[in-house]
Amino acid sequence: MSIRLRAEMADLPAYAPGKTVPGAIKIASNETVHGPLPSVREAILKATDLINRYPDNGYLDLRERLAKHVNFAPENISVGCGSVSLCQQLIQITSSVGDEVLFAWRSFEIYPLQVRTAGATPVAVALRDHTHDLDAMLAAITDRTRLIFVCNPNNPTSTVVDPGELARFVAAVPPHILVVLDEAYVEYIRDGLLPDSLGLVREHRNVVVLRTFSKAYGLAGLRVGYAVADPEIVTALGKVYVPFSATSVSQAAAIACLDAADELLARTDAVVAERTRVSDALRAAGYTLPPSQANFVWLPLAERTLDFVARAADNRIIVRPYGEDGVRVTIGAPHENDAFLDFAQRWIAPGGAGPRTGDSA
């Protein structure tokens, strides 16, 4: 007799992270190339002395430090095992069978999976020019809508919503619907496009900002994220939280990162400079790509996506495909970017997809 599982699990795909191939250049998962600062390493090492003890499940020290960092009260802060766990918690506290959760598409791949797992209905609104079509999202709101995700900058297309348009969108959403501004890549925004998302939290009780230590702060392997929200929402998030899921080592590392925030965020300038160099070189080679405000670029290659990815793998370069929509390429170290650009220029050349492994250039 087979185990009786929920019927809807049968056709629910598992989340597929970026591949790792030993010895290859991996620019598929939007990781920072920089390791932790010495002060962060020291905090991590010190925290291992107490790993036989359970971590602080209330995250008191970390919440106080985060509150100072964003100029809110600790009661406005919720900590999670990466911001992805907070996405799931936000769905759990708002949505169930018969409810709808709205998001752009393509956007963060986890949204529809988490929505379906909760028994709710995902409603995907097509992007316009690779960014959120906020008017179309407003038009898609129904009396069943409970939650709206705005991934900004958008993953995987790298674009950011105009700050003024975002503010008007938030103001137009009915106040009983939660609006989640998922800002995993906010530290890479330049060109005057940084939204006043925390100001929107102050103005609107239904707005939540999600941020993470996985990208600019370089703690992807330790899994720490946080939400800034109304205390009522924070309290509800605590009711569906998996206890102890942000470890004592993770908390210590996050606090040390906040102590060194200026130094860590200065590293993003180097990433942005490389982003500009890579984007310019790709356009010069003949690629079309939207302006990136993240630590990656988006190549909308359509039906050529899978060939590009396979040929890149032949050249020991791992990038991230999204069906037949396009390819996401992380901005890596300069030498990694050079290797990628060399391949990309050969691939797009007339008659070319670049030499396969073992072929001469």
UniProtKB/Swiss-Prot annotation:
<dbReference type="GO" id="GO:0030170">
    <property type="term" value="F:pyridoxal phosphate binding"/>
</dbReference>
<dbReference type="InterPro" id="IPR001917">
    <property type="entry name" value="Aminotrans_II_pyridoxalP_BS"/>
</dbReference>
<keyword id="KW-0663">Pyridoxal phosphate</keyword>
<dbReference type="GO" id="GO:0000105">
    <property type="term" value="P:L-histidine biosynthetic process"/>
</dbReference>
<comment type="function">
    <text>Aminotransferase that catalyzes the conversion of aromatic amino acids and 2-oxoglutarate into corresponding aromatic oxo acids and L-glutamate.</text>
</comment>
<dbReference type="InterPro" id="IPR015424">
    <property type="entry name" value="PyrdxlP-dep_Trfase"/>
</dbReference>
<protein>
    <recommendedName>
        <fullName>Aromatic amino acid aminotransferase</fullName>
        <ecNumber>2.6.1.57</ecNumber>
    </recommendedName>
</protein>
<keyword id="KW-0808">Transferase</keyword>
<dbReference type="GO" id="GO:0008793">
    <property type="term" value="F:aromatic-amino-acid transaminase activity"/>
</dbReference>
<dbReference type="InterPro" id="IPR004839">
    <property type="entry name" value="Aminotransferase_I/II_large"/>
</dbReference>
<dbReference type="InterPro" id="IPR024892">
    <property type="entry name" value="ArAT"/>
</dbReference>
<dbReference type="InterPro" id="IPR015422">
    <property type="entry name" value="PyrdxlP-dep_Trfase_small"/>
</dbReference>
<dbReference type="GO" id="GO:0004400">
    <property type="term" value="F:histidinol-phosphate transaminase activity"/>
</dbReference>
<dbReference type="InterPro" id="IPR015421">
    <property type="entry name" value="PyrdxlP-dep_Trfase_major"/>
</dbReference>
<feature type="modified residue" description="N6-(pyridoxal phosphate)lysine">
    <location>
        <position position="215"/>
    </location>
</feature>
<comment type="similarity">
    <text>Belongs to the class-II pyridoxal-phosphate-dependent aminotransferase family.</text>
</comment>
<keyword id="KW-0032">Aminotransferase</keyword>
<dbReference type="Pfam" id="PF00155">
    <property type="entry name" value="Aminotran_1_2"/>
</dbReference>
<dbReference type="InterPro" id="IPR005861">
    <property type="entry name" value="HisP_aminotrans"/>
</dbReference>
<dbReference type="InterPro" id="IPR050106">
    <property type="entry name" value="HistidinolP_aminotransfase"/>
</dbReference>
<comment type="subunit">
    <text>Homodimer.</text>
</comment>
